């Protein structure tokens, strides 16, 4: 007879017989399923509806980042054998799928990113994949938690930037903490979803993903590209808030009307152009 322990050892040996690259691809698949397809629902029909809404709510930058993760893992060392720690991490990620806490998938992502970046420093492709995974975790989980902690100050900073611009171009400006307006007749309150911080973390996700896709090694000039992404997102967001504070009609247009779409596309294209320039040009000249 074969004991459970023997079966367990045979299973581990069988997993170790796989190439390390294949093992880590399966790890990425498990993480992807947790992030995109683990949607609670009471029935299959409800699940499909919730899944469609969930996938549609994700930014294009999220999907670009996942393409980068799988591409970098696929380009990693071909002949390296799987390690016991790889199997343990994969099994831990799969087992974490039974937990219902929303933070669990992000903690699994963070742990996997750290594993790639620390354990695989000699394989620059896997280290780069870890950087993209960390950017995903920062955008989806750690960034919002950080924002909650510093929300008061970050929202005041956004309001101060817009208030200063209004004061320089209009008279009779109303400005108190996070309340700003061009006149007594109209004011807006800067809430969390309007903050530049959310778009900054998304812009940095695009920058990291495209940079790592183009070249796995960082160069010194990359920091300036990242800062350019941050500055552009802040400038565009402040411009939108400025226009929303001018009057009721302007608010409707830029908050829920066509202006909202213009802002979204302008931000997306600007971040893409800057990130692509940094990925394709900066690396050649540094």
Annotate each PLM feature.
Residues 2-286:
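Hydrophobic N-terminal alpha-helices or hydrophobic patches in metabolic proteins across all domains
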């Amino acid at each position: 007879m074969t004991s459970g322990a023997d079966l367990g050892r045979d299973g581990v040996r069988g997993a170790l017989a796989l190439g390390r690259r294949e093992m880590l691809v399966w790890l990425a698949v498990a993480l992807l399923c947790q992030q995109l397809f683990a949607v609670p629902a009471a029935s299959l029909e409800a699940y499909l509806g919730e899944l469609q809404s969930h996938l549609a709510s994700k930014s294009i930058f999220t999907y670009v980042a996942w393409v980068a993760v799988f591409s970098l893992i696929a380009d990693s060392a071909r002949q390296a054998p799987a390690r016991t720690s790889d199997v343990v991490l994969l099994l831990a990620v799969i087992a974490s799928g039974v937990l219902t806490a929303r933070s669990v998938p992000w903690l699994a992502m963070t742990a996997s990113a750290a594993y790639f970046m620390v354990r695989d420093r000699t394989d620059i492709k896997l280290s780069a994949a870890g950087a993209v995974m960390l950017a995903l975790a920062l955008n989806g989980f750690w960034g919002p938690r950080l924002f909650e902690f510093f929300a008061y100050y970050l929202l005041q900073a956004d309001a101060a930037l817009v208030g200063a611009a209004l004061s320089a171009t209009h008279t009779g400006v109303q400005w108190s903490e996070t309340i700003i307006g061009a006149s007594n007749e109209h004011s807006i309150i800067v809430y969390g979803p309007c903050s530049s911080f959310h778009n900054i973390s998304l812009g940095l996700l695009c920058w990291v993903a495209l940079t790592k896709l183009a070249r796995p090694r960082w160069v010194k000039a990359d920091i300036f590209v990242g800062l350019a992404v941050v500055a552009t997102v802040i400038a565009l967001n402040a411009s939108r808030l400025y226009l929303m504070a001018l009057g009721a009609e302007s608010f409707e247009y830029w908050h829920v009307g066509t202006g909202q779409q213009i802002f979204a596309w302008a931000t997306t294209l600007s971040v893409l152009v800057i990130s692509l320039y940094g990925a394709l040009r900066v690396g050649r000249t540094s």
